[in-house]
Amino acid sequence: YLLETLARGRDGLVVWGAGPIGKAFAREVQVQGGSVRAFVDLDPRKIDQRIHGAPVIHPSGIDEYRDGFSVAAVGQEGARRQIRAELESAGWEEVTDFVAVA
């Protein structure tokens, strides 16, 4: 549904969260024919790694993926609020440019 509606016409997805939820979400996106351009995470051990072929970046690098659609896939309490604040401060609009799925 997400690929056919909100993310339609965008250059792939940017998944916030390189943990179990984000990885599972990305696998399903790929099964459905979508592409994940990058993962965004705060964990320095994950940054610069690759997951399912996509790089893991720090939130400060999000502007490079402005043409993608961001999806917050983090289950940690408070993460959704933090991700929303980060994206909105960078000029992204909820629903138009990003949604939370976890």
Language model features by range: what are they?
Residues Y1-A102:
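Hydrophobic, well-ordered beta-alpha structural blocks that scaffold small-molecule cofactor pockets
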